[in-house]
Amino acid sequence: MKFDILTLFPAMFEGPLTESILKRASDKGLIEVALHNIRDWAFDKHATADDAPYGGGAGMVMKVEPIAGAIEAVKAKNPNSKVILTTPCGRPFNHQFAEELSREEGVVIICGRYEGVDERVRTLFVDDEISLGDFVLTGGEIAAMVIVDAVSRLVPGVLGSDESAQYDSFADGLLEYPQYTRPPEFRGEKVPDILLSGNHAEIAKWRRKEQMRRTLASRPELLDGIEWSKSDKKLFVEVEKANQEKVAR
């Protein structure tokens, strides 16, 4: 999986991309992350990559020519890469979006800055736009880091176990179940007995119900439209009943 990141501030990526899982994935050749300084494609001696907006207004706008040059240089080597723009105007980034991108041959991420990019970048080059949420960051670099991390962990072999991604929050539309490790008791809080029982069928059932319970409590909108299996539907009825009894107390 190849990521090409177009940015005005490539040094921002040194830490997040050179530690832990992403570093190991890169060392194994499972992912490749290339950083490209947009200013390298500027035309003047000052490497100008932004200018005042036509029509007036505050701030600066990223110029189309340097971004176009960077995209064309990258696409010349990886013509099938999908071009993504980080922007508050984009599609909300979620697990399903990350899965979509993980199936691409490569992804080019344009990190927006200032008041945004010249609209002609969108018109001529961008395949899709991504937003992390209803808030504004100082630039798209942090968003790009999030995208690389979320997509990379879905690439086969990146995680220690393929099951790690399979049971993540949102992988099946629900939040993840609670996790415990040693010690079995800490400050009066005990690990649920079922997890110590060795009964894998009952453990799986408990975990599934906990996914439902946690999702119902924290993100009930995620439950809309879920098509339950017969066994899941039975479990969810039990979870709803327990939740109603808890509220009634």
Curated annotation (Swiss-Prot):
A Pfam family assignment: tRNA_m1G_MT
GO cellular component, one term: cytosol
Broad class of enzyme this protein falls into: transferase
GO BP annotations, alphabetical order: tRNA N1-guanine methylation
EC number(s) recorded for this UniProt protein: 2.1.1.228
GO molecular function: tRNA (guanine(37)-N1)-methyltransferase activity
Subcellular localization(s) per the UniProt record: Cytoplasm
Keywords linked to the UniProt accession: Cytoplasm, Methyltransferase, S-adenosyl-L-methionine, Transferase, tRNA processing
Record InterPro entries: Alpha/beta_knot_MTases, tRNA_m1G_MeTrfase_C_sf, tRNA_m1G_MeTrfase_TrmD, tRNA_m1G_MTases_N, tRNA_MeTrfase_TRMD/TRM10
CDD domains reported in the protein's UniProt record: TrmD-like (cd18080)
SUPFAM superfamilies assigned to the protein according to its UniProt record, in alphabetical order: alpha/beta knot (SSF75217)
Catalytic activity: guanosine(37) in tRNA + S-adenosyl-L-methionine = N(1)-methylguanosine(37) in tRNA + S-adenosyl-L-homocysteine + H(+)
Positions of S-adenosyl-L-methionine binding: 112, 132-137
Keyword Transmembrane helix: no
Subunit comment: Homodimer.
Xref: HAMAP family: TrmD
Known function: Specifically methylates guanosine-37 in various tRNAs.
Family: Belongs to the RNA methyltransferase TrmD family.
Protein known as: tRNA (guanine-N(1)-)-methyltransferase
The organism of origin for this protein: Citrifermentans bemidjiense (strain ATCC BAA-1014 / DSM 16622 / JCM 12645 / Bem) (Geobacter bemidjiensis)
Lineage: Bacteria, Pseudomonadati, Thermodesulfobacteriota, Desulfuromonadia, Geobacterales
